[in-house]
Curated annotation (Swiss-Prot):
<keyword id="KW-0234">DNA repair</keyword>
<dbReference type="InterPro" id="IPR023073">
    <property type="entry name" value="DnaE2"/>
</dbReference>
<comment type="similarity">
    <text>Belongs to the DNA polymerase type-C family. DnaE2 subfamily.</text>
</comment>
<dbReference type="InterPro" id="IPR003141">
    <property type="entry name" value="Pol/His_phosphatase_N"/>
</dbReference>
<dbReference type="InterPro" id="IPR029460">
    <property type="entry name" value="DNAPol_HHH"/>
</dbReference>
<dbReference type="InterPro" id="IPR004013">
    <property type="entry name" value="PHP_dom"/>
</dbReference>
<keyword id="KW-0548">Nucleotidyltransferase</keyword>
<protein>
    <recommendedName>
        <fullName>Error-prone DNA polymerase</fullName>
        <ecNumber>2.7.7.7</ecNumber>
    </recommendedName>
</protein>
<keyword id="KW-0239">DNA-directed DNA polymerase</keyword>
<dbReference type="GO" id="GO:0008408">
    <property type="term" value="F:3'-5' exonuclease activity"/>
</dbReference>
<keyword id="KW-0963">Cytoplasm</keyword>
<dbReference type="InterPro" id="IPR004805">
    <property type="entry name" value="DnaE2/DnaE/PolC"/>
</dbReference>
<dbReference type="GO" id="GO:0005737">
    <property type="term" value="C:cytoplasm"/>
</dbReference>
<dbReference type="GO" id="GO:0003887">
    <property type="term" value="F:DNA-directed DNA polymerase activity"/>
</dbReference>
<dbReference type="GO" id="GO:0006260">
    <property type="term" value="P:DNA replication"/>
</dbReference>
<keyword id="KW-0227">DNA damage</keyword>
<comment type="function">
    <text>DNA polymerase involved in damage-induced mutagenesis and translesion synthesis (TLS). It is not the major replicative DNA polymerase.</text>
</comment>
């Protein structure tokens, strides 16, 4: 017998969070495999998964229908399907309405909302399926018919239960009474039946119970999957299956019909986007080139403006320009980066600070006709003032037309294990022990080993189920959050383009699509990003201006300062933007930067792309004159001249494709995109053949062509654009110059911009002290909230360094202290600044009351007395007989410093243990630098950082600190696994190993690790670990 045609019209994906158990792509592929005529994705009050489903259906040639399931507050469950573009806009607006009136994650829908969306009736151009409950009311059906005449149905959902026949008969009678036709739907929650255990776990998690406690809340069987048409034909009358095709035929909308329109109010009356962009670009050129615009720049500007006009992107550039102008008007440091720095127009407008004409950067890396996608401009703002910029956008365009893009939070290994374990009834102690035992680099195949280490048999059925479900959950959407700064701004109501909902943060809204969805749909996104170093540099410059009496801006920093480069050549770069990592510090003495372009290369070279493409060593050897630079052809040599014949940047690969293999600039950009995705998706093969053929046609050696292809593959998704590296290099140089010439201001700026960077405040302070900076502890009599320079140039730490102390209390203290006479004692401080017991206790613990009460114990006593006096005598000062308490020991003070401040200005903890350590032949970090290559040696230090880069083939790099500085430890994979507990769990780590010395770069290669944390007693320190 022939199988009936069928279209699934009620289907949830895992974007119905904690309900659906399959990805949209899985559903589309399965629907095709089952021979379905169409598939509707109808996630609950959401269109978050529709772009993924649309792309998958398009790839498979499957008809895709956009819809959503929603329930009114009085329990009416409806599925809406969009017929056309207008219907889609109405559905999107309805979802927005329901979401915006509820807290994040929820929605509230009333029946009359269906009529409020459009003046022309209830949700025009949408079809409605009513999913009745167990005791449906004919009144609900009659209401539906009256509001949606000719476009409403009763959804019949049969799941092979004993009551199916009775339910079908009841719904047929209901349909006759109400005048509603019936249609078969599946209430699909998974693409295959095997996902049922995952769906059960999701249900239990949603209900905050275990699978065993969930009971009847779980589905009775696994029928809510995309069933075969044979199976459906045995459950449903033929006419109900045929009706699915009639409904699907009425749903003609495709997501490809969406068209984005740029905002227009940034364009003055009487101007067009093209004329205004040209006018502002001309103004910018006069500012950038006061001595006259070079002919090459003028030619480049005309080329860019022509391509921008052809692609109709003028309004996009002007929108970003307007945002940057606002930031500059408010003295907010900002700087464009990424591929936007390839644009001379962006440089003229002041959006970016890198002159692309000087570096011959390719505009097609940014805007390409062949790519046909809107450009993507990333702008970094001071992280503490970015909210001002965000609120400017909301104020200018309104929350109806501006919203942040979503970011999709998915399950990772630890979260998947934790949630699966909870739902399956494992104990919290077991779950915590397991997740705590995992390192960030543990692979899936290592999980059974971790289970076994905790005494759990990985082959026991219950544990196997835990592992299997956790594995299935990895990569599952958990919830939507807001993107770090990607804004979507539209000309009309944004809600008719994509649903908008409230963000967790007040005064913010977020769309239901993430950046990948936006890229796929060609919607404009402006990235308003936060960069801590911009905040730090602005603070540093402000302090320098205050101390010198001359206001200073970034453009006032002298260019090409030899002392700054000399400092970087010695890897003295702690706290310096982008070159403070272990890998960068190891590279600096080898590369020895002498000018700004060297910094551009430095930023790009220590990246997975050049490392995996085997470009680092050839570059360094050729730079140092130890390897000959191969001459290929004049055109090729010109592209690679500045990088010694080695392609370091994405733009160079694109230029090589153009000059060596006859690619067009647009084709070269397509090559770049294929490079970025080939490890995940493949797709480089056609480009390889074209490269080989093109280079052969130009008589270039095949060996050179093969080497370039191998390097392209090495680049993978990690190749660095020169434009991006140049933008970052500006901040590298500025921060390095400030560290070299104004180290105290540099330290203040970093401390006042935390959290940021690789290093903790403790390490930054230790480094500054090694550079001669005097650092003073927090003091309630002299400290502000922020750290600052005193009249002698010393850094006075701010009250922000005291853990748990509030900025409000600090501001009250500084306000009272400045307006009136200094505080007399702790009771006077409490009374005049309105401090509570907790405030005083925190100040005493942070040793910030020393000027008023003496050492910590005395201060804690004074705080207690002040509170008692305030309670008994209503704040009236009372003379209290002084009680002399013994001062804490050095060790007790160290413990208290780290507990309260996370740092100490007293002796380093290891200086107190040095004699004990020396007796056991543990040498200092300074001693390591004096020893020779291959020396067998032992050292010890407080663990301040662990890193395991993806390019390091399993090697873990550990940074240890002692009283003389930092030491770098290399732990190879075999030792990582053998001594993972010591590696991951030690606060004080002893290392027996062998020195590896290359010039100024010294590494201790570990042979054995020893956990010596017990020697620190109660001292609490924190390591900063990075993937």
């Amino acid at each position: 017998m022939s199988l009936p045609e069928y279209a699934e019209l009620h289907c949830l994906s895992n974007f119905s969070f904690l309900r659906g158990a399959s990805h949209p792509e899985e559903l589309a592929a399965r629907a095709l495999a089952q021979g379905y005529a169409a598939l509707a994705l109808t996630d609950e009050c959401s269109l978050a998964g529709v772009v993924r489903a649309h792309l998958a259906a398009k790839k498979h040639g499957l008809k895709f229908i956009v819809g959503s399931e929603m329930m009114t507050v009085d329990g009416l469950k409806l599925v809406f399907l969009a017929c056309n573009r207008h219907g889609y806009g109405n559905l999107s607006a309805l979802i927005t309405l329901a979401r915006r009136r509820a807290e994040k994650g929820g929605y509230t829908l009333h029946r009359n909302d269906l009529e409020s969306i459009s003046p022309s009736g209830a949700l025009p151009d949408c079809l409605v399926l009513w999913v009745p409950g167990n005791n449906p009311s004919s009144a609900d059906g009659e209401w539906l018919v009256s509001r949606f005449p000719g476009r409403s149905w009763i959804a019949v959902e049969l799941h092979a239960g004993p009551e199916d026949a009775e339910r079908l008969a009841g719904l047929q009678s209901l349909g006759e009474v109400c005048g509603l036709p019936l249609v078969a739907t599946g209430d699909v929650h998974m693409h295959i039946k095997a996902r049922r255990p995952v769906q059960d776990v999701l249900t239990a998690l949603r209900l905050k119970s275990t699978v065993f406690e969930a009971g009847y809340a779980l589905f009775p069987n696994g029928e809510r999957h995309l069933r075969s048409r044979l199976r459906l034909s045995r459950l449903y009358p033929p006419e109900l299956l045929a009706e699915t095709l009639n409904i699907a035929a009425r749903c003609e909308f495709l997501l490809d019909e969406l068209r984005y329109e740029y905002p227009e109010e940034i364009i003055p009356s009487g101007e067009t986007p093209a004329s205004w962009l040209r006018s502002e670009t001309e103004r910018g050129l006069q500012r950038r080139y006061p001595a006259g615009v070079p002919g090459s720049v003028r030619e480049r500007i005309e080329h860019e403006l022509g391509l921008i006009a052809e692609m109709a992107y003028e309004a996009y550039f002007l929108t970003v320009y307007d945002i940057v102008c606002y930031a500059r008007s408010q003295d907010i440091l900002c700087q464009g980066r990424g591929s936007a720095a390839n644009s001379a127009v962006c440089y003229a407008l002041g959006v970016t600070e890198v002159d692309p004409a000087r570096s011959a950067l390719l505009f097609e890396r940014f805007v390409s006709k062949e790519r046909g996608e809107p450009p993507d401009i990333d702008v970094d703002f001071e992280h503490e003032r970015r909210e001002d910029v965000i609120q400017y956008i909301y104020t200018k365009y309104g929350r109806e037309r501006a919203a942040l893009a979503a970011a999709l939070i998915t399950y990772r290994t630890k979260g998947a294990l934790r949630d699966a374990g909870r739902a399956l009834g494992f104990g919290i102690a077991q779950i915590n022990a397991l997740t705590a035992s995992l390192a960030w680099w543990d692979k899936r195949e290592q999980l059974p080993e971790r289970f076994a280490e905790l005494g759990l048999d990985p082959h026991a059925p219950r544990v196997e189920k835990w592992l299997a479900i956790a594995e299935a959950l990895r990569g599952f959407p958990r919830h939507l959050t807001q993107h770090v700064g990607g804004f979507v701004i539209s000309r009309g109501p944004l809600s008719r383009l994509v649903p908008v909902e409230n963000a967790a943060m007040s005064a913010r809204s977020v769309i239901q699509w993430d950046k990948d969805d936006l890229d796929a749909m060609g919607l404009m996104k402006v990235d308003i990003l936060a960069l801590g170093m911009l905040s730090a540099i602005r603070r540093m410059l402000q302090i320098v201006g205050e101390t010198t009496g001359r206001p200073m801006k970034m453009q006032d920093i002298p260019a090409e300062d030899p002392a700054t480069y000399e400092m970087l050549c010695h890897a003295d770069s702690m706290g310096v933007f982008q070159v403070e990592s272990r890998a960068q510090m190891a590279m600096l003495p080898r590369l020895r930067p002498q000018n700004f372009y060297d910094l551009v290369v430095e930023v790009a070279l220590v990246r997975p792309g050049p490392i995996q493409g085997d470009m680092v060593h050839p570059y360094l050897k050729r730079r140092q004159g130890r390897e000959r630079i191969e001459e290929i052809s004049p055109a090729v040599d010109a592209v690679l001249e500045r990088t010694y014949g080695v392609p370091i940047f994405q733009e160079q690969v694109m230029q090589l494709a153009v000059v060596a293999a006859n690619f067009t600039p647009g084709e070269a950009d397509q090559l770049r995109r294929a490079m970025a995705a080939w490890k995940r998706k493949g797709g480089l093969e056609p480009f390889e053949q074209k490269l080989l053929a093109g280079m052969a046609a130009n008589d270039l050696p095949e060996s050179f062509a093969r080497r370039i292809i191998a390097q392209i593959q090495g680049f993978g998704e990690y190749g660095f654009p020169e434009s991006h590296a140049a933008s970052f290099a500006l901040l590298v140089y500025a921060s390095a110059w400030l560290k070299r010439h104004h180290p105290a201001a540099f330290l203040c700026g970093l401390l006042n911009s935390q959290p940021m960077g690789f290093y903790s405040p403790s390490m930054l302070i230790q480094d500054a002290r090694r550079h001669g900076v005097r650092v003073l502890p927090p003091d309630v009599m002299t400290s502000d909230w922020d750290s600052r320079l005193d009249e002698r140039g010393a850094v006075r730490l701010g009250l922000r360094e005291i853990s748990g102390f509030s900025v409000a209390a600090a501001k009250r203290i500084t306000a009272v202290c400045r307006e009136n006479q200094p505080f007399l004692n702790v009771a006077d401080l409490a009374a005049r600044a309105g401090l509570q017991r907790r405030d005083l206790d925190l100040l005493a613990a942070g040793d910030a009351l020393q000027g008023l009460a003496g050492h910590r114990r005395q201060a804690a006593w004074a705080a207690t007395v002040a509170v008692v006096q305030g309670d008994l005598f209503d704040g009236t000062p009372v003379v209290e007989a002084e009680i002399e308490l013994p001062a804490p020991s050095d060790g007790e003070n160290l413990v208290a410093d780290y507990r309260s401040l996370g740092l100490t200005l007293r002796s380093h903890p290891l200086s107190l243990l040095r004699q004990y350590l020396a007796e056991r032949r543990f040498v200092t970090a300074a001693d390591l630098k004096m020893a020779g290559h291959h020396t067998l040696i032992r050292s010890v230090g407080i663990v301040v950082g662990r890193q395991r880069p993806g390019t390091a083939t399993g090697i873990v790099f550990v940074t240890l600190e002692d009283e003389t500085g930092l030491s770098n430890v290399v732990v190879h994979p075999q030792l990582v696994e053998k001594q993972r507990r010591e590696l991951l769990g030690s606060t004080l780590l002893g290392v027996y190993g062998q020195l590896q010395v290359e010039g100024e770069v010294v590494h201790l290669v570990a042979k054995r690790l020893v956990d010596l944390s017990a020697w620190l007693g109660r001292l609490e320190t924190v390591s900063r670990d990075f993937h």
